[in-house]
Amino acid sequence: MKRSDLIKRLSRTDKWYLGGANRLLWAPPFPVFLDSPGFWDEAHYYNVELKPLFTWTLLNDEGAEVTLTQIRRKWDPAGIRQEYIAKLKGVSIKITEVKAVLPNDVALSEVILKPSGRRSVKVHVVAWTTQEHEPSKNTSWLEDVDYRSGLISFRRHLRPSVSPQLEVACAFGLSRPCNSHSINLSERTALQPHWKLTPWTDLFKDGCLPGDKKLTGAHSDGLVYMAVHRELLLRPATETRLSVGFAASPASQESQNNLSVALHQKDPSALSRTSWNDHFLAVPFFECSDEFLTTYYWYRWYGLKLNTEYGTEGNYKRPFVCEGIGYFRAPISYSAPGHMLENRWMHDPALAQGSLLTFIDNQREDGGFRGYIDVNHYRQEMFYHANWGRALLQLETLHPSLEYLGAVYDGLARYAAYFDRERDEEVSGLYDIDNHYETGQEYMHRYLEVDAHADQDHWGSVFRLKGVDVTVYMYELKCALAVAADRLGKSDAAELWRLEAEKIKTAILQKMWDPSDEMFYDVDPKTGLRTNVKAATCFYPYFTDIVNETHRNGVKRHLLNPREYWTRFPVPSSSCDDKYFSDAPEWKGKRMNCPWNGRVWPMTNSHIAEALASAAVMYRDESLRKRAAEFILKFVRMMFFEADPSRPNCFEHYNPFTGQPSAYRGVDDYQHSWVNDLLIKYVCGIRPEEFSVLIDPFPFNLSHVMIDDVYIRGRRLKVTVSGKRFTIWLDGKHHTESTLGDPIQVQI
């Protein structure tokens, strides 16, 4: 497999998300007009819905619509190729539309028309959009609507819900000079891409639109229809090309410039292909004999880029990865450390570094991190616990930077101080969960043990529960701060962080570990007693150095038990023997959006994979190594439709017995976990340490594995696995060979 084949490898017919890793994303969760030309279903500018973008219509010389019959569609990360057939005056016309969202926030339709037969035929292409204009309601309105030099431009003001309004400057036009145009205010009708609903069914005369701009009437509210038109003479068996584009940005001139650049390209959709190829060149190359693992590795890199934003506007000053599409199209603190773990393998660390810096840039006055950051305002109360310490140290093992450590140290120290001050009033070394939303794991039995109404209220100080997960996060943060302080020459601070981390470790071992059950449990701060509620988070200490030989049997007794967690598609977020357990997405009889009482969440699975693999390494336990490999394989295979290796997905949660995803939510490509970090560390066996790199592939029983272009501290690493042997190359030269189970330490 060649890198040039990667876009093609991911192609399929059942997908439609398009993005250029910037502000504009077209990923409608439930598209209604997918077969229509253009982009009529909703797009998102940042996390704000922007709809529609545009469609285009063919007319004959009398102004009647030429019917298009859609015959096939094929998607890949760079675009959608949609084919139609039309008939005009007895001539059959094959029409190919290539849709793409470019890195400069231009949604593009490249239209190729090719008539059959021996006669030329004239056709009119009208590209048009309809924008809501409701100034009296103060929800969505337009300003500065204008037509100039073939482009229509306008500023759209969007005020979703109670949020502050966001202004988007838009531009819309064709790649060829326009023959005519029209801008027309209308009372409301259905917002659909059907020519019969437009005002121009009566106004397109003599082969032209009226060339007017009518934006006033008895009242100002309604729909503003905007169109540009081009007449084309199609010659027999000859391709005629025309592109339609819609640009969005903060400034009108920027949108118009971006649109002009795109429309003047000979092959404008090539800008998208180049951008995606460049992205795949910027990460390690991986392939193996398991097509599920190979496909998912590259699919994951697609998902990370799809949800990346590089826009520098408002609260956003750095690049970062959003948690997902739609509502999730923002930096969200629970998922950001996972993005750091995966993006640290990119050749350039800027994106991984930006995930943390974005939250430090927007840190609260009390030291806490905001749970969700909008581009132009802050939401009140939202907060999520997250493992920033692990992500920071893992990033530093690949791309060490004193400058970066210095940039994040004070912010993370303030964050730790917030927890000590606000989340541990007993000074116990264990830290509080205040509501069931802030863990990112709502609707679980664990919270009801301290408050019977814990699932009734959402944000704020609802209850107090000393959580295993949040306490482990704080332990790893203070360990990381100790390392950072040492490297920054703050030796006294480093010693203090180590003492504080040791206090947390002791508290977890003494207060959360149940020697009889052989399980870590949350603690009720009112009684100081363990809750004895089994949740997948109870295994989180196993991915740290908190555990020792005493705890070995616990992971086997519970995690590998089919009656608790080792389901066909492990692991459920709550144990199968929990009284609130449900494999269906139901909580107390009602289907929910995000229940954690039995569904398999990729986010949990990433943590559990790390816990199981770390335990295998710590205990030097071959049976656990095999189980860890088995688990990662099951985890990845779960995220394919109908076990089809060509149709990967990543939804919020899955059924632990059937692997059925939460498709009813419409949220695919949800970056709320990490996968490629696991594949590189355990399938390929590359685990960077402070002064060396351990090469130790796990027993996945693969006939072939190859990873190349892994850059660690400026050195290039390549590893291949063939059966039970593996080989290492360093900087393009053969380094050494070994056998699975006999790891090699490479000094880098």
Region annotations inferred by a language model:
Residues 288-309, 343-346, 350, 359, ...:
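Active-site acid/base region of carbohydrate-active enzymes
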Residues 488-525, 554-716:
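Non-catalytic carbohydrate-binding regions of carbohydrate-active enzymes
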Residues 218-225, 271-413, 466, 479, ...:
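Substrate-binding groove/exosite segments of carbohydrate-active enzymes
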Residues 110-112, 124-130, 142, 151-159, ...:
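Short, well-ordered alpha-helical packing segments
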Residues 1-289, 614-618, 667-670, 685-748:
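Terminal accessory carbohydrate-recognition/targeting modules of carbohydrate-active enzymes
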Residues 102, 116, 126-130, 364, ...:
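An acidic- and aromatic-residue-enriched active-site/binding cleft used to recognize and process polar
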Residues 237-260, 265, 370-387, 403, ...:
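The feature captures the catalytic groove of carbohydrate-active enzymes
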Residues 88-90, 115-119, 346-351, 362-368, ...:
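Secondary-structure transition/capping motifs at alpha-helix termini
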